[in-house]
Amino acid sequence: MSNIIKQLEQEQMKQDVPSFRPGDTVEVKVWVVEGSKKRLQAFEGVVIAIRNRGLHSAFTVRKISNGEGVERVFQTHSPVVDSISVKRRGAVRKAKLYYLRERTGKAARIKERLN
């Protein structure tokens, strides 16, 4: 029984997901439906958390919009997510960057990873 579930989940997983880590700046393009129109909307920010659970994997992206912090959780293999592109690699030493919520301005900067 579980082999059938694993096979179905494997078929539904996206193959074109780039590798990224917490601290990386990513741009996620998401399909948004407004009335009868369907368009792509970009959301660019820093990955502060990743949850790896196969088909149910998710990641949290944080950005500052008009001086207000905005966080959004995306399901990695969701059909709503069109594409994910890594803009900048960040060097951090923790898996969850929740401490960035309290920091603003230059204190919230992340060093760039060189490799």
From Swiss-Prot:
Induction of its expression: Part of the rpsP-rimM-trmD-rplS operon.
Subunit annotation: Part of the 50S ribosomal subunit. Contacts L14. Forms two bridges to the 30S subunit in the 70S ribosome, contacting the 16S rRNA. In pre-50S ribosomal subunits interacts with RsfS, which may inhibit association with the 30S subunit.
Role: This protein is located at the 30S-50S ribosomal subunit interface and may play a role in the structure and function of the aminoacyl-tRNA binding site. In the 70S ribosome it has been modeled to make two contacts with the 16S rRNA of the 30S subunit forming part of bridges B6 and B8. In the 3.5 A resolved structures L14 and L19 interact and together make contact with the 16S rRNA. The protein conformation is quite different between the 50S and 70S structures, which may be necessary for translocation.
Similarity field: Belongs to the bacterial ribosomal protein bL19 family.
Gene3D superfamilies associated with the record: 2.30.30.790
Highest taxon in the source lineage: Bacteria
Any GO MF annotation of the entry: structural constituent of ribosome
Key words of the record: Ribonucleoprotein, Ribosomal protein, RNA-binding, rRNA-binding
GO biological process, one term: ribosomal large subunit assembly
A single Gene Ontology CC term: cytosol
Protein name: Large ribosomal subunit protein bL19
Lineage per the UniProt record: Bacteria, Pseudomonadati, Pseudomonadota, Gammaproteobacteria, Enterobacterales
